[in-house]
Amino acid sequence: MKKQNNLRSLAAQAVELVVEQGQSLSNVLPPLQQKVADKDKALLQELCFGVLRTLSQLEWLINKLMSRPMTGKQRTVHYLIMVGFYQLLYTRVPPHAALAETVEGAVAIKRPQLKGLINGVLRQFQRQQETLLNEFATSDARFLHPGWLVKRLQNAYPTQWQHIIEANNQRPPMWLRVNRTHHTRDGWLGLLEDAGMKGYPHPDYPDAVRLETPAPVHALPGFAEGWVTVQDASAQGCAVFLAPQNGEHILDLCAAPGGKTTHILEVAPEADVLAVDIDEQRLSRVYDNLKRLGMKATVKQGDGRYPAQWCGEQQFDRILLDAPCSATGVIRRHPDIKWLRRDRDIAELAQLQAEILDAVWPRLKPGGTLVYATCSVLPEENRDQIKTFLQRTPDAALSETGTPDQPGQQNLPGGEEGDGFFYAKLIKK
């Protein structure tokens, strides 16, 4: 069956679901991808990610060029116009094709009477583009982040906040993790070169490789056989700090989708690993990852605040707590985060993190290691969280990562490096 859906209208619907209904793009996009031909999937993804990355700018332009916002049943048209702006500003789609296809999108969303309006706004933008962009360059919207997040970053990083924002607005590099049970990193890099691709090793994380140019996973040597996994370099730091050993009982808490679970088992194939996550649906991806890599772990659904429900009285040699967080360190990878999070979420997340930490600490054996990690850059979830935990937990000591006054290691997103990530390694006295 030939797939004939209008890409621009699908992108507009996806962005509307994210911004208006708070759905994540990772949930919204896959069903829409099924509606388009394989050759068009990359463009649909580019339009969705791109519009969400630059949403502040596109919204600003609409407010300049339209006297009143589109509301109610016409709201999708608002996002369709954004898709048009994005193509004209950021893609290599020829302007005449961008205009024609975007205008035609009105028919696909059953608003053919608005074709003239869409065409008029996009043509007006083309005529005024230089003037508008000069004005935009001095507006608050130029940071492409919600105001509350800009303020938090300015407060937390007085000299680095612009670097963080610029990094968040870039396209992310593609990092891989070589499965050391199959190949050395250098050995796999040789296979990659034989396949006509180039990769670069990370200086600190022994399994990490950055592709010179992102590629589909099926093109990677041995991906289906489990020789390599897509995982950001910073996420690989979790297993480095955890340093799992064969024969140990290890808890991976908040484990989905299973990237860190499988990394633990690559480092320590004889470890006994329990992977727990609250989200039953996302646990299916843990099973998928274990299966592709040919590994075994115990996988359970459970709430980190109530360990008795999923592990009884069991104690562990090592615990990895990749805590639920604002994900403000991975915005370049998931631009919808900027529009899904709210300022009030941060205090709620910090409270949840503290509850999980307090609940699982008694499950760590004396002398054991707990690595607390987040993909956040906000101190409330990171340094402040660990500082207060150490103050109220006399048998916890910091190891390798920072000082009691400035606990943990904070990686900031940037360039070809890894995502924004925080780690604190704690030892039980």
Curated annotation (Swiss-Prot):
<dbReference type="GO" id="GO:0006355">
    <property type="term" value="P:regulation of DNA-templated transcription"/>
</dbReference>
<keyword id="KW-0489">Methyltransferase</keyword>
<comment type="function">
    <text>Specifically methylates the cytosine at position 967 (m5C967) of 16S rRNA.</text>
</comment>
<dbReference type="InterPro" id="IPR029063">
    <property type="entry name" value="SAM-dependent_MTases_sf"/>
</dbReference>
<dbReference type="GO" id="GO:0009383">
    <property type="term" value="F:rRNA (cytosine-C5-)-methyltransferase activity"/>
</dbReference>
<keyword id="KW-0949">S-adenosyl-L-methionine</keyword>
<dbReference type="InterPro" id="IPR006027">
    <property type="entry name" value="NusB_RsmB_TIM44"/>
</dbReference>
<feature type="region of interest" description="Disordered">
    <location>
        <begin position="397"/>
        <end position="419"/>
    </location>
</feature>
<dbReference type="GO" id="GO:0005829">
    <property type="term" value="C:cytosol"/>
</dbReference>
<feature type="binding site">
    <location>
        <position position="303"/>
    </location>
    <ligand>
        <name>S-adenosyl-L-methionine</name>
    </ligand>
</feature>
<dbReference type="InterPro" id="IPR023267">
    <property type="entry name" value="RCMT"/>
</dbReference>
<comment type="similarity">
    <text>Belongs to the class I-like SAM-binding methyltransferase superfamily. RsmB/NOP family.</text>
</comment>
<keyword id="KW-0698">rRNA processing</keyword>
<keyword id="KW-0963">Cytoplasm</keyword>
<dbReference type="InterPro" id="IPR023541">
    <property type="entry name" value="rRNA_ssu_MeTfrase_B_ent"/>
</dbReference>
<dbReference type="InterPro" id="IPR048019">
    <property type="entry name" value="RsmB-like_N"/>
</dbReference>
<protein>
    <recommendedName>
        <fullName>Ribosomal RNA small subunit methyltransferase B</fullName>
        <ecNumber>2.1.1.176</ecNumber>
    </recommendedName>
</protein>
<dbReference type="Pfam" id="PF01189">
    <property type="entry name" value="Methyltr_RsmB-F"/>
</dbReference>
<feature type="binding site">
    <location>
        <begin position="254"/>
        <end position="260"/>
    </location>
    <ligand>
        <name>S-adenosyl-L-methionine</name>
    </ligand>
</feature>
<feature type="active site" description="Nucleophile">
    <location>
        <position position="375"/>
    </location>
</feature>
<dbReference type="GO" id="GO:0003723">
    <property type="term" value="F:RNA binding"/>
</dbReference>
<feature type="binding site">
    <location>
        <position position="277"/>
    </location>
    <ligand>
        <name>S-adenosyl-L-methionine</name>
    </ligand>
</feature>
<dbReference type="InterPro" id="IPR054728">
    <property type="entry name" value="RsmB-like_ferredoxin"/>
</dbReference>
<dbReference type="Pfam" id="PF01029">
    <property type="entry name" value="NusB"/>
</dbReference>
<dbReference type="InterPro" id="IPR049560">
    <property type="entry name" value="MeTrfase_RsmB-F_NOP2_cat"/>
</dbReference>
<dbReference type="InterPro" id="IPR004573">
    <property type="entry name" value="rRNA_ssu_MeTfrase_B"/>
</dbReference>
<keyword id="KW-0808">Transferase</keyword>
<dbReference type="InterPro" id="IPR035926">
    <property type="entry name" value="NusB-like_sf"/>
</dbReference>
<feature type="binding site">
    <location>
        <position position="322"/>
    </location>
    <ligand>
        <name>S-adenosyl-L-methionine</name>
    </ligand>
</feature>
<dbReference type="GO" id="GO:0070475">
    <property type="term" value="P:rRNA base methylation"/>
</dbReference>
<keyword id="KW-0694">RNA-binding</keyword>
<dbReference type="Pfam" id="PF22458">
    <property type="entry name" value="RsmF-B_ferredox"/>
</dbReference>
<dbReference type="InterPro" id="IPR018314">
    <property type="entry name" value="RsmB/NOL1/NOP2-like_CS"/>
</dbReference>
<feature type="compositionally biased region" description="Polar residues">
    <location>
        <begin position="400"/>
        <end position="412"/>
    </location>
</feature>
<dbReference type="InterPro" id="IPR001678">
    <property type="entry name" value="MeTrfase_RsmB-F_NOP2_dom"/>
</dbReference>
